From Swiss-Prot:
Carrier of the growing fatty acid chain in fatty acid biosynthesis. It comes from Blochmanniella floridana. Belongs to the acyl carrier protein (ACP) family. InterPro entries: ACP (IPR003231), ACP-like_sf (IPR036736), PKS_PP-bd (IPR020806), PP-bd_ACP (IPR009081), Ppantetheine_attach_site (IPR006162). It is found in: Cytoplasm. Pathway: Lipid metabolism; fatty acid biosynthesis. Its main location: cytoplasm. One of its GO terms (molecular function) is phosphopantetheine binding. This is Acyl carrier protein. Keywords: Cytoplasm, Fatty acid biosynthesis, Fatty acid metabolism, Lipid biosynthesis, Lipid metabolism, Phosphopantetheine, Phosphoprotein. 4'-phosphopantetheine is transferred from CoA to a specific serine of apo-ACP by AcpS. This modification is essential for activity because fatty acids are bound in thioester linkage to the sulfhydryl of the prosthetic group. The modification O-(pantetheine 4'-phosphoryl)serine is found at S37.
Length: 78
């Protein structure tokens, strides 16, 4: 597991109040991890802060799974 992947999973677990082992790559924030729309906004903000990136709204809407978040950060990290 890469450092980025590990950090992303830790942030998701903390933001959504789920156990780390529930945060698997294919998990959907809403369907599998019980996030609502406010949770997903807060999650995006936490990822932006941790990785010092900006996630535009149109991109944030596409980030619906753990893997999508990891992929976005790998692609856009400075």
């Amino acid at each position: 597991m890469s450092i980025v992947e590990e950090k992303v999973k830790t942030i998701i677990a903390e933001q959504l109040g789920v156990k780390q082992e529930e945060v698997v790559n294919h998990a959907s924030f809403v369907d599998d991890l019980g996030a609502d729309s406010l949770d997903t906004v807060e999650l995006v903000m936490a990822l932006e802060e941790e990785f010092d990136i900006e996630i535009p709204d149109e991109e944030a809407e596409k980030i619906t799974t753990v893997q999508a978040a990891i992929d976005f950060i790998h692609t856009n990290q400075k």
